[in-house]
Amino acid sequence: MNIHEYQGKEIMKQYGISVPRSRITFTVEEAVQAAIDLGCEVIAVKAQIHAGGRGKAGGVKITRSLEETKSAAEAILDKILITKQTGPEGKVVNQVLIEEGLKIEKECYLSCAVDSTTSTVVLIGSPEGGMDIEEVAEKTPHKIFKESIDPAIGLQQYQARRLAFNMGINEACLQEAAQCIMNIYRLFMEKDCSMVEINPLITTEEHKVVALDCKVCFDDNSLCRHPEILKYRDLTEEDPREVQASKYDLSYISLSGNIGCMVNGAGLAMATMDMIDHFGGAPANFLDVGGGATAEKVKEAFKILISDKKVAGIFVNIFGGIMKCDVIATGILQAVNALDLDVPLVVRLEGTNVELGKEILKSSWLDVITVNSMAEGAEKIVALVNGKGVVRDERLN
């Protein structure tokens, strides 16, 4: 689960991490009043959306007067902000953070995440803050420093000090920076985060260490242990189809293609999308119904698929292990019948009760095409979508 920058900073304050004074606002009038109340010479007006790259897209503006603050808020609020992470459709900015400006001495980068290679938590630091860490890693990899953490003993003080030193923190701020790193790790572990990032982590002319910008993400599977985190969820920042899918324990991610995919298992889903791409098609989504899907779940999955107006065809690719193919077949027929499906549907079933499942589909009067392999199914749905009218007419005749 993603949260906004200002929410991440609220949590960081609970862990003793210094952040600038700020206030979240929803109107231009509120933004101006917040600037007055902060009483700072320099004010940052920052768009709050669930995406990075806001600064380069014009979503962060530095102002030095109330008139400039007002103009900046007017330019950002209720506008669509397009960054490299939002996609071409962008995101509407519903709120802006009004934040005090600080006198920056140095900018650094700091993050905490799980290293998929070693399956351990790793802290990443760099003296190059305020820019894309991917760009730093590509052009100057020697400026990226890592501290892998032994899960048996946790982060040690000497590791935090070493990372702070490698990040170029001056001696006057070294101890405070090391403590900040320790606090970030504690936040990461106690809140079951998937990532905590501060970019930039700054030192000020007053020798303070401050998180100027941050990103905090949580493991969805851990939210049952953290009801206090759920209050931060902003459904307006999420795809409505993804929200609906989560209600039925379905994993859904919207993509840019026009072929809807319904699969069980993340690995099979990835293979299915690759196969569709191989035959010249483009998947419209990643939809994993999981290992224990019921007929009701399948019906809801179809509702989500056809709610995407880009979908011109659907490929169902199911391997029945715990899940029985006859149950899936029944769910498919119920969904097609109830939803009046008007796009081509190709189904490949394999596994438990597969013959019974195929028989259920073939004996129905509904327009469902069954295939025997993933490759055959992918090729068929791509052909149907690319030559939709001709192919379907030939079949129906």
Curated annotation (Swiss-Prot):
A GO molecular-function annotation: magnesium ion binding
Superkingdom in the source lineage: Bacteria
Binding sites annotated in the UniProt record for substrate: 264, 321-323
Gene: sucC
Chain positions recorded as ATP binding sites: 46, 53-55, 99, 102, 107
Residues covered by the ATP-grasp domain: 9-244
Pathway involvement of the protein, from the record: Carbohydrate metabolism; tricarboxylic acid cycle; succinate from succinyl-CoA (ligase route): step 1/1
Cofactor: how bound: Binds 1 Mg(2+) ion per subunit.
Pfam families with a match to the protein in the record: ATP-grasp_2, Ligase_CoA
Annotated TM spans: none
Role this protein plays: Succinyl-CoA synthetase functions in the citric acid cycle (TCA), coupling the hydrolysis of succinyl-CoA to the synthesis of either ATP or GTP and thus represents the only step of substrate-level phosphorylation in the TCA. The beta subunit provides nucleotide specificity of the enzyme and binds the substrate succinate, while the binding sites for coenzyme A and phosphate are found in the alpha subunit.
Binding site for Mg(2+): 199, 213
Gene Ontology annotations of biological process type: succinyl-CoA metabolic process; tricarboxylic acid cycle
Protein name as catalogued: Succinate--CoA ligase [ADP-forming] subunit beta
Quaternary structure annotation from Swiss-Prot or TrEMBL: Heterotetramer of two alpha and two beta subunits.
InterPro entries: ATP-grasp, ATP-grasp_succ-CoA_synth-type, ATP_grasp_subdomain_1, Succ-CoA_synthase_bsu_CS, SUCC_ACL_C, Succ_CoA_ligase-like_bsu, Succinyl-CoA_synth-like
Family: Belongs to the succinate/malate CoA ligase beta subunit family.
Species annotation: Alkaliphilus metalliredigens (strain QYMF)
Catalytic activity reported: succinate + ATP + CoA = succinyl-CoA + ADP + phosphate; GTP + succinate + CoA = succinyl-CoA + GDP + phosphate
EC number: 6.2.1.5
Named cofactor requirement(s): Mg(2+)
Keywords, comma-separated and alphabetical: ATP-binding, Ligase, Magnesium, Metal-binding, Nucleotide-binding, Tricarboxylic acid cycle
GO CC terms, sorted: cytosol; succinate-CoA ligase complex
